[in-house]
Structures are given as C-alpha cells and as structure tokens.
C-alpha cells in the first residue's frame, strides 16, 4: 500500500517514525533491531500494510527511541486527529 492509500492516522504514525529515525540517524533496520521487532513487521507499518499496529509493537518502537508513549504521541498532528474524533 502506498502513502496515498493510508488512513490519516497511519500516515501520521509513519511520518512520526520517519522524523524520529532521521533525527537519530536510524535506518528502519536499526530501528527494528533496537525495538526487538521483526524488520518485516516494521516495514508492514511503514508501507501501510498494517492498518492497526498493536500497542505492544508501538511501545517497543517507543522504547527503541528511548521515549514514552506520551512523548511519541505528543505532536500537533496526533493532537489534531484526537480533536477530530471529539
């Protein structure tokens, strides 16, 4: 699936991962290794094949970035999604 076919939520999640990887100089491979998740799992998220990644997987990604779930999701983009739901 390409980015044009992703839901807004998926696109924001992928963008957040991409920004953090770039800031930290991580590749997808190193992120998967640090998060102790299969590389294919991460790539399914990045490509949008996984529509709803599990909380445990997202927590492991946050751990790899050495941040809490709150820090990971504390962005203007995620906040706007939450506000749309309310």
Where are these regions (language model features)?
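Short, basic-rich loop-to-helix N-cap that marks the start of a DNA-contacting helix
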Residues: 49-60
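The DNA-recognition helices of helix-turn-helix-type DNA-binding domains
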Residues: 38, 49, 76-80
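Short alpha-helical DNA-recognition segment
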Residues: 25-44
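DNA major-groove recognition helix of helix-turn-helix
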Residues: 21, 46, 57, 76
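Short, charged recognition helix plus adjacent turn
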Residues: 1-7, 44, 73-86
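A short, Lys/Arg-rich alpha-helix, primarily the initiator
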Residues: 1-27
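The alpha-helix within a helix-turn-helix
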Residues: 21, 32, 62
